[in-house]
Amino acid sequence: KTEINNSISPLTRFLLLAGVVYAGWQLLYDLVLLPDGRLDTFLSLSGVRLASGLLTLLGWDVEISGRVITCLGHRGVEINNGCNGLHLLGLYAGFIIAYPGPWKQRTLFLTGGLILLYLANAVRIGFFAVFNASLPEYWHVAHDYSSYVFFYPIVLSFWYLWTVYNQQEQIIAAS
C-alpha cells in the first residue's frame, strides 16, 4: 500500500478521491435523496421560512405559502428542488472530504461551511423575493448569477482556508 501511495502524486490522489466522492454523492442523491424528497423539501421550506424572518426583520411585508415567498403586492418566488442549495452543499462537502487533513478539523470545516452555506441560501431566497418585487424583468439574470455572489465566495474561501490550514499542519508535522 505504501508503494502505491508513493507512486501516485498528491494531486492525482486528490482528483481520484474527489471523483469517487462526487460520483458517490450523485448516486446517493439520484437514487436515495431525490426519490425520497424529504431533504430537498426541508431545505426548501426552511430556507423560505428563514428568508421570510430575515425580510420581516428588515421591514419587508412578506407572505409564505409552502415553498413560495412573496413580498406583498408582487409575484412570489417558488424554491424548487434543485434550487435549494443541496447540490452545492454536496460539492462543498466532497472537496473537504477529498482533500487530506485530520478528521477532527475536517468535521469542523464541514459543519461550519455547511451551516454558513445553508444560511447564505436563506439570504439568497430573500434576495430573490425582493429582486422579483423590484425588478421582475431581470429575474432570470438574478437567478442565473446569484450563486456567484452568494455561494462561490463562501465555498472558495472555505476551500482555500482548508488547503492553507492543512499545508501549515504538514509543515508543523514535518519539523
Can you say where each PLM-predicted feature lies in the sequence?
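Hydrophobic N-terminal alpha-helices or hydrophobic patches in metabolic proteins across all domains
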Residues: 1-175
